[in-house]
Amino acid sequence: MNRHPASTLAEGRHRYTLRVYYEDTDAGGVVYHASYLRYAERARTEALRDLGIPHAALTAQYGLMFVVRRIKVDYLRPARLDESLTIVTEPLVVGGASLVLRQEVQGSAGACAVLEVQLACVQPGGDKPARLPPSYRATLAKMRDARVGCDAIVRHDAGVRRDTGIGAAP
């Protein structure tokens, strides 16, 4: 698996750690509000990759992709230049054509922001929802139910399948 070194998956939660760079901040050294959206996007991408269901495989094998349908952000406290942040991602709802994730950006003094993101599955260029492949839905549901880790997945990205009982073959 091509896992990011700052990425872990355990007990139904994915953790992705990054550092705040100057480019992420305003003139006062505080993380600019839109930077949290980028952080969450990176963390979601790495979570899917660590589950063995990366964006590229969903498109290549099924002709589908995720788009953000709705996002809600609660900003709780500022993060600052050079601070180490961990983004914790966990699925709340796994539907037939969408999923809802909770993402918490954690800093040295606690939670900085909490995001609730609804992703819709669509065909590229399409504006109508498409059903998630059953094995993807099953993998995400197992994560939601806190029963999946990096070693208990169905690989979709490299043509390798480890039979774990988490869904059908791709």
Residue ranges, per PLM feature:
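Hydrophobic pocket/interface hotspot
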Residues: 29, 89, 127
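Short, surface-exposed acidic-centric catalytic microdomains
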Residues: 50-57
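HotDog/MaoC-like acyl-thioester-processing domains
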Residues: 2-8, 13-16, 49, 75, ...
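Helix-adjacent hinge/juxtasegments
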Residues: 60-91
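Residue-level recognition of specific faces of alpha-helices
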Residues: 36-39, 67, 118, 139
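Catalytic strand-loop segment that frames the active site of acyl-thioester-processing enzymes
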Residues: 2-50
